[in-house]
Swiss-Prot record:
InterPro entries: ATP_synth_F1_dsu/esu, ATP_synth_F1_dsu/esu_N, ATP_synth_F1_esu_C, ATPsynth_dsu/esu_N
Membrane topology label: Peripheral membrane protein
Subcellular compartments: Cellular thylakoid membrane
Protein name: ATP synthase epsilon chain
PANTHER family, per the entry: ATP SYNTHASE DELTA/EPSILON CHAIN, ATP SYNTHASE EPSILON CHAIN, CHLOROPLASTIC
Any one GO cellular component localisation term in the record: plasma membrane-derived thylakoid membrane
Family: Belongs to the ATPase epsilon chain family.
Example GO molecular function: ATP binding
Transmembrane intervals: none
Function, in words: Produces ATP from ADP in the presence of a proton gradient across the membrane.
Length: 137
């Protein structure tokens, strides 16, 4: 028995295929989903989702930009603000964006709370894309 996994962003369906296992970046940490999982509705943080289609296959990585996941009767539906498959991300561009976002985060004034929030969001987004592309473990 397998899971039916769908990742849907406002502009496209990023993933719609069966899977043996899914790991999600929930707001409280990594969340593993296998067949027979209890019903669940959870918020997702910006991060990397990992999907394994079959037991002997490699993990597929998808960068998620926050959203929600619902698990019910071996169906995993993931609604996100944005998503990008790791195999579609240019590693060097993702590395450059990550380095730029990290530098921007380190340069923000500790007194400018709004700038800190924006820089942190940009860093999390760049880190997720870089990780999904295979740049960070």
């Amino acid at each position: 028995m397998t899971l039916t996994v769908r990742v849907i962003s406002p502009d496209k369906t990023v993933w719609d295929a069966p899977a043996e296992e899914v790991v999600l970046p929930s707001t409280t940490g990594q969340l593993g989903i296998l067949t027979g999982h209890a019903p669940l509705l959870t918020a997702l943080d910006t991060g990397v989702m990992r999907v394994r289609a079959a037991k002997n296959q490699n993990w597929e990585a998808i960068a998620l930009l926050g959203g929600f996941a619902e698990v019910e009767e071996n169906e995993v539906t993931i609604l996100v603000n944005g998503a990008e498959r790791g195999d579609k991300i240019n590693l060097e561009e993702a590395r450059a964006a990550y380095n730029k976002a990290e530098a921007g985060l380190n340069q923000v004034s500790s007194e400018d709370r709004q700038a800190q929030i924006k820089a942190n969001q940009a860093f999390k987004r760049a880190r997720a894309r870089f990780q999904a592309a295979g740049g960070l473990v």
